[in-house]
Structures are given as C-alpha cells and as structure tokens.
C-alpha cells in the first residue's frame, strides 16, 4: 500500500493548477444517465472516485470514454441495467446519486446502500423521502434501495440541508411530470454547477444558487458540453500548505468567489491574499496566527477545510477553538496530529488548539480524505520525516498531490509498501 514521505524543505514558491472539483464531477457524471445523448465534461479530475463512477456507469450499460487527462464523454443511450451493485457502491457514498436520474428516466432503480469516508452518520433518508413525495415506491431490502414508479412534481421540503439530497432530487425533478418545488436546498458551488449543466441539457430550473429551486419537468434532456467548476477544497488545501511553510504561490484555474470565507480566515491568520477571476495568490512571511473555526453549510466555513486549518492552527501563535457542526466523529486527525507534537484536546464537537512552535515528524495514518490532507500539511512544517500511511483516502480526492506540491518546492514522495 502506498505511503507519502514528507520532510520540511522551507517556503513554497511557484504556481499550481487547481483541478476540477470532485464533488461537482461525480454528480455531473451521474447526470449522463438522464439523457440518451452525449454529455461531454471537461476539467474532470482523474481520481479514484471518478474512476469508480466510470465503472459504475459502464456497468449500467452507459458508454463512457475518456482521454485519461481531464475529459469524459458519457452516453446514456445504451443503458440497459438499472442496478448499481454493492461491489462498486460500497467504496463511495456518491454512488447514491445514480438513484434519482435512473428512476426518473427508466421508472425503476436499485442502488446498494453506500460506503465512503467513515466520518459519522450521513444517511440518505432525505433522498428517499423526497423521491417518495414525488410518487416513488421505495423499499430497502438485502442492503439495496429499490425504487419504482413514475415521478410527478410536488413540493419537497428537506428536513436538513443536504448536498447529495439536493442533487439527487434536482436530477430526478428534471424529468418528473409537472412542477417540483425543492425547499431548503444546499447552495454549494457544486450544486450550482450541476444545475447549470442540467439547464444546458434542456432542464427548466429557476432559483439556482438559492435555497428554493423550482423545476418544471420536461419529456427529455439532450447532451451538452460542460466544464467542471474548480475544486475549492483542493485550492484551500494548497493555500494552507503555503500558510504553514511560508512563501508565495499562485493558484491557476481557481474560483475565488466560491471560497471567500476560507480566504478571509487565511488573511486573519496573517496571509496576504490577492485574487482575480480565475487565480489566487498567497504570500506568507510570518508564523500563522491562531484562528477560530466553526463549520457550517455554504456559504459558511466548509467542513471539508476543517482538518487542514487544524494543522495550520497546530503551529500557530496563540490558541483557538474549532467547532464541527456538520459531521460527528470528524476529529480523527487530532490523535495523529498530537503524535506529531500538536497540543489539541477535544470535547464533544469542539477542539481546543494551543499552538506549538514546531511539530516533529512521525508515522501517521490517514483516516479519511480531509484528515489525510491535514497530515500532509503538518508534515511540510515538521522537523524530521513524516510518513503518511493509508493514502488511498487521499487519492479519492486529490489529483497528484505529491507532484503538485513538489512542483513548488515541497519535499514529498510516494513510496510503495
């Protein structure tokens, strides 16, 4: 199993190109099931989850072509199987996103209950409740969600804000008979990106980017060409890496307007930030200052950046509190950071961080996707060598992270065994 070996190597300097967002690419790929036409996606990150989604769609009969760099062509005209099996779904929660489009287009779907990162309860009850409100008959048996029925437009008020639930119901509503009103929608940039692509495909959606979307169902959707929105979490991860090591790095193919709260927190930590329409520059010449973090739904501070800022706060001047309100059990990186010399205690959903002057390298284990990113960031500033194990988590969400960081001066290498 691959590992990353990391050693501090001074400030980072240069340019990094940000990949497309995994959390946008996966639902966009699933949207290919809504049409018999061809959906052409650009700026797709070549990640483990993307490849799993490719296999899943191909297993359902869709024709999926890729240049293995950043482009995919998905044709749903050849779909001949409405079942998403456990073997693929178990590794990735986003697999549940085939449920809505498959049911809407074919009138039936079977999807194994999903897997993914072990960061607490992330149930799919809102997905199922919404589809039932639209007329679906749903049973759960033998580990599968089995749904059938012709969907009809209705009012769906989600009990909690859910990104995946919003995406699943939005896709389903595009082909439902009549008008669907989706209330308490997630407004993350990735949801907006999906909605904008669906409109290109012929969907009639109003209220995009707000908590209430109105969808007028159409008889069919067409293919289109769409570029995946840049990954704000990958961009934020690289910015934290520069903030902890010092230096100046420019991120290209970035989307600063999707991550303003993260940029504000970096400024609060002492970084100088400049940004244009599609680039972000960070200049860090001092020890970071501790910053309080409270994760909330977009447009607040994203839970997917909590672990990276925990690493930054670990070596910051002063003390702070980090409050996690989105997921329980999302402090699994804390014991690993403490193994490196951090001074972090937890109480319920709150972590108390007392900054130390320097961390020391250690062998640490990645426990989930963003936790693994925090350990990489910590290793860049630690004295001695850090070895991050179980980096298959990292590969689910970061495209060539060691090459990108290495290109700006980080001492980081992937090793086998």
UniProtKB/Swiss-Prot annotation:
Entry keyword set: Cell cycle, Cell division, Cell shape, Cell wall biogenesis/degradation, Cytoplasm, Peptidoglycan synthesis, Pyruvate, Transferase
Predominant location: cytoplasm
Assigned EC number: 2.5.1.7
GO cellular component: cytoplasm
Active site: 117
Entry keyword annotation includes Repeat: no
Alphabetical list of Gene3D superfamilies matching this protein: Enolpyruvate transferase domain
Coiled coil: none
Keyword Cytoplasm: yes
Biological process, per Gene Ontology: cell division; cell wall organization; peptidoglycan biosynthetic process; regulation of cell shape; UDP-N-acetylgalactosamine biosynthetic process
GO MF annotation: an example: UDP-N-acetylglucosamine 1-carboxyvinyltransferase activity
Residues that hold phosphoenolpyruvate according to the record: 22-23
Modification 2-(S-cysteinyl)pyruvic acid O-phosphothioketal occurs at: 117
InterPro entries: Enolpyruvate_Tfrase_dom, Enolpyruvate_Tfrase_sf, MurA_subfamily, RNA3'P_cycl/enolpyr_Trfase_a/b, UDP_GlcNAc_COvinyl_MurA
Broad enzyme group: transferase
Location(s) in or outside the cell: Cytoplasm
Pathway participation: Cell wall biogenesis; peptidoglycan biosynthesis
Catalysed reactions, as listed in the record: phosphoenolpyruvate + UDP-N-acetyl-alpha-D-glucosamine = UDP-N-acetyl-3-O-(1-carboxyvinyl)-alpha-D-glucosamine + phosphate
Residues that coordinate or bind UDP-N-acetyl-alpha-D-glucosamine: 93, 122-126, 304, 326
NCBIfam families, A to Z: murA (TIGR01072), PRK09369.1 (NF006873)
Similarity section: Belongs to the EPSP synthase family. MurA subfamily.
PANTHER family listed in its UniProt record: UDP-N-ACETYLGLUCOSAMINE 1-CARBOXYVINYLTRANSFERASE
Stated role: Cell wall formation. Adds enolpyruvyl to UDP-N-acetylglucosamine.
UniProt name for this protein: UDP-N-acetylglucosamine 1-carboxyvinyltransferase
Gene that encodes the chain: murA
């Amino acid at each position: 199993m691959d590992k990353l070996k990391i050693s501090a190597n001074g400030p980072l300097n240069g340019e990094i190109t940000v990949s497309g967002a995994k959390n946008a690419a996966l639902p966009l790929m699933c949207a290919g099931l809504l049409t018999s036409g061809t959906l052409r996606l650009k700026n797709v990150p070549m990640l483990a989850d993307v490849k799993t989604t490719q296999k899943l769609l191909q297993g359902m009969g869709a024709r999926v072509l890729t240049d293995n760099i950043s482009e995919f062509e998905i044709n749903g005209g050849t779909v001949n199987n409405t079942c998403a099996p456990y073997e693929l779904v178990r590794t990735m929660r986003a697999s549940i996103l085939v449920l809505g489009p498959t049911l809407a287009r074919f009138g039936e779907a079977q999807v194994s209950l999903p897997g993914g990162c072990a960061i607490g309860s992330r149930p799919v009850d809102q997905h199922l409740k919404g589809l039932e409100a639209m007329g679906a008959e749903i049973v759960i048996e033998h580990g599968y969600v089995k749904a059938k029925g012709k969907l009809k437009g209705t009012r769906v008020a989600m009990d909690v804000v859910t990104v995946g639930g919003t995406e699943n119901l939005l896709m389903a509503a595009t082909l439902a008979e009549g008008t669907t009103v989706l209330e308490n929608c997630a407004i993350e940039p990735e949801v907006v990106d999906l909605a904008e692509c669906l409109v290109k495909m012929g969907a009639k959606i109003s209220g995009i980017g707000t908590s209430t979307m109105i969808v007028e169902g159409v008889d069919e959707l067409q293919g289109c060409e769409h570029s995946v929105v840049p990954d704000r979490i990958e961009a934020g991860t690289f910015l934290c890496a520069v903030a902890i090591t010092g230096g100046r790095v420019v991120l290209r193919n970035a989307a600063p307007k999707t991550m303003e709260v993260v940029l504000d927190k970096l400024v609060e930590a002492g970084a100088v930030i400049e940004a244009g329409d599609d680039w972000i520059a960070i200049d860090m010449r001092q020890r970071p200052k501790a910053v309080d973090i409270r994760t909330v739904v977009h447009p607040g501070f994203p839970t997917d950046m909590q672990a990276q800022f925990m690493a930054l706060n670990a070596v910051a001047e002063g003390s702070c509190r980090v409050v996690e309100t989105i997921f329980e059990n999302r402090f699994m990186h804390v014991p690993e950071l403490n193994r490196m010399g951090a001074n972090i205690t937890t109480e319920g959903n709150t972590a108390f961080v007392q900054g130390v002057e320097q961390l020391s390298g250690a062998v640490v284990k990645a426990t989930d996707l963003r936790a693994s990113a925090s350990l990489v960031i910590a290793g860049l500033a630690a004295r001695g060598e850090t070895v991050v194990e179980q980096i298959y988590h990292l590969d689910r969400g970061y495209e060539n992270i060691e090459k990108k960081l290495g290109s700006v001066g980080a001492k980081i290498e992937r090793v086998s065994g």
